[in-house]
Amino acid sequence: MMVMISLHFSTPPLAFLKSDSNSRFLKNPNPNFIQFTPKSQLLFPQRLNFNTGTNLNRRTLSCYGIKDSSETTKSAPSLDSGDGGGGDGGDDDKGEVEEKNRLFPEWLDFTSDDAQTVFVAIAVSLAFRYFIAEPRYIPSLSMYPTFDVGDRLVAEKVSYYFRKPCANDIVIFKSPPVLQEVGYTDADVFIKRIVAKEGDLVEVHNGKLMVNGVARNEKFILEPPGYEMTPIRVPENSVFVMGDNRNNSYDSHVWGPLPLKNIIGRSVFRYWPPNRVSGTVLEGGCAVDKQ
């Protein structure tokens, strides 16, 4: 937009300024420089003649004004911007704001390769523990001498996807409903040996474990049971479990058969302590059920 302004005045030149209260004219200290104020403060387009009391020469000055967007007010650049520091200029503050607004630390960035690797590893580990195998710690003497306090073992979970538990399997299991009624929870995990399966008739008589009327030959127990137990028929989808330390074990002879759904897995390997590393599966597997 082009604006032509024609001003006629007497030398020495004057700058036209308007104050907030009263209009007044200020003499320009530099006669060779014409000072202009914003359009809103200029007193024009009237012709102005000033009588200074002296004989002054009169001259006419023509001015052209052009609208330049570079003159409009802009935000001040950051003090850290520019080419002096060799940076990209003006983005440092934004980076600080983004850093403060992070929900997770930079190393936990879901888009980074390292974070993805960690999360995949955790997911695989949890899946392995939930579906395949998990480590366990022995806290008591109920399975002594097979397991001592502090022994660590691996319990696998794959076998029971394809078959039902067999006699002599050492299983870890969540507390059954009868124990949860007296304060136990699913977080309470036990380890015992299966001595009878569904449909079997089990009893303890004269220091012998009897299954379907036949005494079991158990070389792995600490000592013969010192109690009597009347015959019990193991219900469907259940097993009967006992500790190898028969006289110091809180097991099925006290609280009854164990539902199969409470079984977590089967002990297959002891990896601690080093001098007792060994497998925990008896030779013959489920052959005892065929005797």
UniProtKB/Swiss-Prot annotation:
Q: Does the keyword Thylakoid apply?
A: yes
**Does the keyword Disulfide bond feature in the UniProt annotation?**
no
Q: Where is the transit peptide?
A: 1-67
EC annotation from Swiss-Prot or TrEMBL: 3.4.21.89
Could you tell me which species this protein originates from? Arabidopsis thaliana (Mouse-ear cress)
Q: Where does the protein end up?
A: Plastid, Chloroplast envelope; Plastid, Chloroplast thylakoid membrane
Q: Which GO terms describe its molecular function?
A: peptidase activity; serine-type endopeptidase activity
Reaction(s) catalyzed by this protein?
Cleavage of hydrophobic, N-terminal signal or leader sequences from secreted and periplasmic proteins
Its primary localisation, in coarse terms, equals plastid
> Which residues does the entry assign to the active site, renumbered to this chain?
S142
Q: Give me the ranges of the annotated region Disordered.
A: 69-96
Which biological processes are named by the entry's GO terms? Answer: protein maturation; signal peptide processing; thylakoid membrane organization
Source organism superkingdom: Eukaryota
State the protein's purpose.
Involved in the maturation of the plastid protein translocation channel. Required for the biogenesis of plastid internal membranes. May also function as a thylakoidal processing peptidase.
GO cellular component, as recorded? chloroplast; chloroplast envelope; chloroplast thylakoid membrane; plastid envelope; plastid thylakoid membrane
Family affiliation: Belongs to the peptidase S26 family.
The protein's matches in PANTHER family, at most eight in alphabetical order, are given as: CHLOROPLAST PROCESSING PEPTIDASE, SIGNAL PEPTIDASE I
Q: Which UniProt keywords apply?
A: Chloroplast, Hydrolase, Membrane, Plastid, Protease, Thylakoid, Transit peptide
- The name of this protein is Chloroplast processing peptidase
Gene label: PLSP1
Phenotypic effect of disruption: Plants are albino and seedling lethal.
